[in-house]
């Protein structure tokens, strides 16, 4: 699986390092040194400051927690039971593809980590169901349906750019202020886009399943029941396995989340939705759903592996942003966009450029750190709606996830599929998504 991915592109870490070198080379030729003879040292200093920029490191941890805790929720018993109940309606490829796509997109609009793992587990359960009941199933198409949530997540409640700019003290506040999610995620433009995606994508996958209704489960899905080996719990271990303690702790978190959102404020507002608030709520839900700390921590140990990319790559992107800001490249690129754009074309150019950047920077948070300053500077110069510009970037970032295999790795591991098997179908989702997103950007 990893070998196949690296045949398409280098590892995301290698790409981040290469982008760092490219940024340095461009900055050396484009930027004027403030101290003669020390230009390289100045660039290295700005890079080092960017690596460990405190607000950006907080942002990285917030995104990492959002992925991990969302993954933990997806591994809980209630989610597993829900998937099993829905699976009984998946009797052929067309129905299965439509049902998985709808629920995966719906869940991903709430949390991208949850949507990613939910879709992967759902796809595998449907494959196991087909084998058990001797049903014909195009398993790669089902895998693609389980990955569809990654083309809608940035327009959802956990979208990196929209939730970050809704938080006081974000790193671009001095250029754009704090923008509520009522102007981004819950804007009429994005609500229309989300509704269209929820309707069109499942319908499209249904007819795609009708057209490609072939029996293609070429991998070995173990459907045998695993024997549960009971272990005698003694002494202080009882604390780790205590349902009461997990329910109380998780319940207190959920109670205060509700109290903070609906009781404390004089007016209920979407401003409450910040990265910290989302993670706080997810933590409470995860603790309650796993019923004890032992199960919760076991799920965390499983989920944390998927967050390694955020942990090690985000600082490199922050360093790139530091060099670009110091060297004046942000202003240069912004001026370029201003010169070739107008009020109508700027959101489209933003969407397309974000899609291209996402191929090389497969992280919404990392991309926002690098491209966000350029987009906001250009939008300010053109006097164009900043919320719309942010959403155009979000749409572009998420759509090319259907081409970029980085975030598909957890799904490929869970389903046993290869990237080359799901790619023919995710490319079709990519094309449908472009039509939807460009249309709403032009309408509004």
Can you say where each PLM-predicted feature lies in the sequence?
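Hydrophobic alpha-helical transmembrane segments of multi-pass integral membrane proteins
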Residues: 89-122, 311-327, 338-377, 394
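Hydrophobic transmembrane alpha-helices of multi-pass small-molecule transporters
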Residues: 1-65, 186-199, 203-309, 313, ...
């Amino acid at each position: 699986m990893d070998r196949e991915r690296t045949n398409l592109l280098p590892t995301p870490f290698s790409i981040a390092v290469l982008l760092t070198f490219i940024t340095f080379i461009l900055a050396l030729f484009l930027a004027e040194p403030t101290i003669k003879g020390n230009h390289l040292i100045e660039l290295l200093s700005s890079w080092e400051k960017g690596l460990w920029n405190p607000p950006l490191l907080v942002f990285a941890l917030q995104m990492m927690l959002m992925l991990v805790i969302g993954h933990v929720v997806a591994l809980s018993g209630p989610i597993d039971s829900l998937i099993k109940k829905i699976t009984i309606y998946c009797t052929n490829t067309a129905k299965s593809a439509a049902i998985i796509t709808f629920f995966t997109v719906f869940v991903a609009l709430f949390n991208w980590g949850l949507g990613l793992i939910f879709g992967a587990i759902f796809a595998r359960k449907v494959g196991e169901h087909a084998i058990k009941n001797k049903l014909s199933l195009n398993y790669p198409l089902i895998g693609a349906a389980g990955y569809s949530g990654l083309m809608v997540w940035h327009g959802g409640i956990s979208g990196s750019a929209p939730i970050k700019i809704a938080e006081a003290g974000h790193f671009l506040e001095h250029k754009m202020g704090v923008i509520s999610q009522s102007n981004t995620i819950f804007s009429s433009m994005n609500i229309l886009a989300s509704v269209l995606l929820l309707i069109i994508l499942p319908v499209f996958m249904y007819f795609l399943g009708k057209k490609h209704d072939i029996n293609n489960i070429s991998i070995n899905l173990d459907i045998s029941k695993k024997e549960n080996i009971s272990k005698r719990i003694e002494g202080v271990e009882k604390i780790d396995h205590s349902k009461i303690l997990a329910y109380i702790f998780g319940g207190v978190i959920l109670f205060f989340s509700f109290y903070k959102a609906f009781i404390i404020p004089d007016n209920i507002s979407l401003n409450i939705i910040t990265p910290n608030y989302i993670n706080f709520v997810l933590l409470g839900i995860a603790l309650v759903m796993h019923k004890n700390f032992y199960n919760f921590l076991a799920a965390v140990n499983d989920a944390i592996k998927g967050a390694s990319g955020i942990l090690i790559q985000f600082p490199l992107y922050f360093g790139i942003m530091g060099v670009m800001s110091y060297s004046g490249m942000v202003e240069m690129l912004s001026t370029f966009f201003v010169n070739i754009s107008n009020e109508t074309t700027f959101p489209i150019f933003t969407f397309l450029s974000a899609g291209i950047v996402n191929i090389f920077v497969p992280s919404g948070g990392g991309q926002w750190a690098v491209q966000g300053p350029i987009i906001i500077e250009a939008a300010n110069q053109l006097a164009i709606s900043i919320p719309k510009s942010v959403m155009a970037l979000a749409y572009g970032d998420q759509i090319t996830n259907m081409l970029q295999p980085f975030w598909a790795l957890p799904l490929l591991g869970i389903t046993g599929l290869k990237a080359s098997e799901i790619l023919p179908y995710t490319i079709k989702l990519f094309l449908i998504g472009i039509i939807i997103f460009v249309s709403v950007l032009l309408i509004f």
